[in-house]
Amino acid sequence: MKAVILAGGLGTRISEETHLKPKPMIEIGGKPILWHIMKIYSAYGINDFIICCGYKGYIIKEYFANYFLHMSDVTFDMTSNQMEVHQRNAENWRVTLIDTGDDTLTGGRLKRVATYLDDGEDFCFTYGDGVSDINITKLIEFHQQHGHLATLSA
């Protein structure tokens, strides 16, 4: 199962932070909100993520492009221009980053990532700026038992 995370809004209510970076990249305990959301889903066995990027999406792309390096112990040999990775602390995640536009609304963002979702497969869909204490397994079970098109938690 995949988790689609909306990470493209402007974050106007906390503009003192979001003029530099998108709201999902605001840090809590030294890690972006987005990372915390992904850790929660990962704890429930969901490790395949589609991130709907928009406003300053390049910052999210740069974060994941450099994630492995930042989470590992490395030695840089400046004389030989070599890098040696000693310890890898990366997550067991697959992250697809899609530019869904700066002004695209929620439905439009979901439509733009549809090609990255498997036909007929259930997926989780969440905002990238809020962390909650929801049992994802029970939520998915509830959804599957009731056979509806969508299940909303709030």
Regions found by a protein language model. Name each.
Residues 1-62:
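N-terminal glycine-rich phosphate-binding loop and ensuing alpha1 helix
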